[in-house]
Amino acid sequence: MSEVEPHKLKEVLEAANSAPSAGNLKAREIKVVKDLGTKKALVKAALGQDFIAEASVVLVFFALPEKSGRKYGERGRKLYAIQDATIFASFAWLQAVDLRLSCCWVGAFDDEKVKEILKTPSDWQPIAILPIGYSAE
């Protein structure tokens, strides 16, 4: 599979970072995965969805409930952080499609395994896995 060009990945990440967020807190985070071993581990965490390992790059989006909760309390923790991370991922998706890249929204995964694989803080909540690349024709 062809690799996603660095300038295209940069555009995808810039689009994601331009997404609005509650109170402009940006209570979201992203991990960029290119390592094949890590992608294979994510396949296992995502219930065997093999295409994740085949993608050139995999973006994993997280909500940061505590960051939002410090300003907005329980509503920030349970709603705003989730909305922020989802919009963040959606902007990345839209930019990838605009660049004629193939991507698939993966929402079926074991949260704890994803956090363990990517060594994230315990309060980060995985929201979506977005494998990006060029589809086989």
Tell me the role of every PLM-derived stretch.
Residues 1-10, 129-137:
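Specificity-determining recognition surfaces
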Residues 26, 102-105, 125-126:
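A short coil-to-beta-strand element that immediately follows conserved catalytic motifs
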Residues 63, 108, 134:
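Short secondary-structure boundary segments
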Residues 37, 116-119:
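Short secondary-structure transition/capping segments
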Residues 16, 59, 76-117:
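Small-aliphatic-rich amphipathic alpha-helix that forms the alpha element of a beta-alpha
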Residues 29, 109, 128:
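Residue-level "edge-of-site" marker
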Residues 50-55, 119-137:
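A glycine-rich helix N-cap at a beta->alpha junction
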Residues 8, 13-14, 18-88:
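Glycine/small-residue-rich phosphate/adenosyl-binding loop
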